[in-house]
Amino acid sequence: MPFLTVAGARAHYVHRRPVPASRPPVVFIHGAGGTHQQWLYPVRDLSLSLTYALDLPGHGKSEGPGRDSITAYSDWLVAFLDALGLEQAVLVGHSMGGGIAQDVALRHPDRAAGLGLIATGARLRVTPAIFDGLRQDPEAVVRLVCDLVFGPETPPEMVRLGRRQMGAIPPDVLCGDFVACDAFDVMARLGEIGVPTLVLCGSQDVMTPVKYSTYLRDQIRGATLHLVEGAGHMVMVERPDAVLQALTTFLQQLQQSKL
């Protein structure tokens, strides 16, 4: 389980290095209250790509305080890429992680070789009830969020695992994540993104509905949209095979476009 020093604190990540690695490196970014564990299937099974899945600061095994803005998280991500020695990577982000990926593409366009925007949006408003609940009963908020993020066909044991994983995130870090999401809004700037982009979401996502992904597809030049039927917000956990197939096709097309 490798660690790097990023912004003065230890950052944890997992990675896979196939031989040969003939496609651009891929960095997976989890969402609010998440960890690298949500990306274990694509990290393990995405062939021909050097893959990394990280724990954002304050999450999982990464040390340091969490952040309370998307720009602060994206600055941290750029420092993470520097520490790895990666000049460019395909940034694949889920929910808040998708916001981070968009922000890097807008403010540090030379660092993004492509984007995978998974169950996310150009604006990520959070209901005030979440913030009220975090102050009064964080455990209840975790239960509520996990009841919403999984699709109707999700096995109960997967929902319970999600609750345990999110419940392990310190409440102040979780609150900072939601503050970051609530303030995020790049709806007017999507036309500035100039890298190949895959947009993917579940048809039953109630957190970032399909219309969010449709807007991303329509506003980012050349973006493609892949809809996973029956899946909810945690589409990469619920339907890892479908997400892996879509990412593989996207990376193949990205590689061919650079030949």
Locate the predicted segments by residue.
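Conserved alpha/beta-hydrolase "nucleophile elbow" surrounding the catalytic nucleophile
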Residues: 30, 89, 93-95, 202
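Short beta-strand/loop motif that positions the catalytic acidic residue
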Residues: 193, 199-201, 205
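Conserved alpha/beta-hydrolase "acid-adjacent" motif
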Residues: 206-212
